[in-house]
């Protein structure tokens, strides 16, 4: 039940876009087409669902203070948390590279439409942010970290597909010239963020 609460909260309450404003570059640049946005969103879900649990295990058994005591008691005082950023980024980059090769092989049309934004998932701050938030929240099991990673990815997917659908609908609307493009996208993001704030009253026991 606790994992379910973490999963739902990471989608609607601690949404990467609306609560933390993470991953905004690709969110704004790619969200002009629902199909492309959905493809990128699924890729982000995949990367987060894999990297967050892996980085959780890395933190618990390698990086944190005393994590290496499982090897031998002499390593009980070793603290490798200064390597957190380097190793987290290495894991993320490796998973993204594998994902890029798979997408290019099996869905070349999606690969072409995503362009540079697919490999840039490796430096998407939402991906790194999820692993760092996971570390900060100090989850008690790999299942909880998986729920958080999967939920964070789905939350980002909902955000980018939602705004892409709205931007497609207003494409032929009369929008003031000064607000066209990024301007109206920011306004829409703010309105969607306000809508997601309605979930703040939900509590999990």
Each language-model region and where it sits:
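Helix-coil boundary and interhelical linker segments in multi-pass alpha-helical membrane proteins
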Residues: 1-4, 60-82, 131-146, 205
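Generic transmembrane alpha-helix signature in multi-pass membrane proteins
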Residues: 21-29, 100-106, 117-120, 125-139
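Ordered, amphipathic secondary-structure segments that act as subunit-interaction surfaces
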Residues: 60-114
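C-terminal ends of transmembrane helices
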Residues: 22-36, 96-110, 163-174
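Hydrophobic core segments of alpha-helical transmembrane domains in multi-pass membrane transport
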Residues: 22, 26, 44-50, 89-98, ...
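Cytoplasmic-side transmembrane-helix entry/capping segments in multi-pass membrane proteins
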Residues: 36-46, 84-88, 110-121, 178-184
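Structural signature of hydrophobic alpha-helical transmembrane segments
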Residues: 5-18, 78-92, 147-159
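Interfacial loop-to-transmembrane junctions
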Residues: 168-186
